[in-house]
Curated annotation (Swiss-Prot):
Designated name of the protein: Probable manganese efflux pump MntP
Membership in a protein family: Belongs to the MntP (TC 9.B.29) family.
Record gene name: mntP
A GO term, aspect molecular function: manganese ion transmembrane transporter activity
HAMAP family according to UniProt: MntP_pump (MF_01521)
Pfam families xrefs: Mntp (PF02659)
Organism encoding this protein: Salmonella heidelberg (strain SL476)
Keyword Transferase: no
Length: 188
């Protein structure tokens, strides 16, 4: 695959994580750059691994993976988005749950996995092409690290304007990504 195509693929694959990171950044009270970088590193690491996993699965069982990946992503994103919306509607005081707790490692990993399943599907497709899968996966991971970190910082400025509605908006974004993944699968 040509270098330009790899870069375009990498940034294209990072867009779901970018959108989710904006929502995450908006729900936190002024996240620090270190929190944004942590999010970027988690999203980037997962986004690096999923095309590699997809590539391996593509070699072994491409038909099954391609038939189910969109449903898995859809269910995970609907669940996570619904949870965020419910928490945003319930409200509660900021002391009830610290921003760091709402931004826990496992919640980030789950969100990263849900937004990276399309990269796994791309990895399945790459198994049938002459590509350097390691270089491609690293490019996707680096682009995702950059875009997720940037998304968190953008969310930092949007969050104070939205207040408690930021969590609802973040949930809507995740649900929207899930619907978009399902829509794209059925309507190309």
């Amino acid at each position: 695959m040509h270098y330009t195509a790899t870069v375009l693929l990498a940034f294209g694959m990072s867009m779901d994580a970018f959108a989710a990171s904006i929502g995450k950044g908006a729900t936190l009270h002024k996240p620090k750059f270190s929190e944004a970088l942590r999010t970027g590193l988690i999203f980037g690491a997962v986004e690096t691994l999923t095309p590699l996993i997809g590539w391996g699965l593509g070699i072994l069982a491409s038909k099954f993976v391609l038939e189910w990946n969109h449903w898995i992503a859809f269910v995970l994103l609907i669940f996570l988005g619904g949870r965020m919306i419910i928490e945003g509607i319930r409200g509660g005081s900021d002391e009830d749950e610290t921003p760091l707790r709402r931004h826990s490692f496992w919640l980030l990993v789950t969100t990263a996995i849900a937004t990276s399943l399309d990269a796994m599907a791309v990895g399945v497709g790459l198994a049938f092409l002459q590509v350097n899968i390691i270089a491609t996966a690293l490019a996707i991971g680096c682009a995702t690290l950059i875009m997720s970190t940037l998304g968190m910082m953008i969310g930092r400025f949007i969050g104070p304007m939205l207040g408690k509605r930021a969590e609802i908006l973040g949930g809507v974004v995740l649900i929207g990504i899930g619907v978009q993944i399902l829509w794209t699968h059925f309507h190309g």
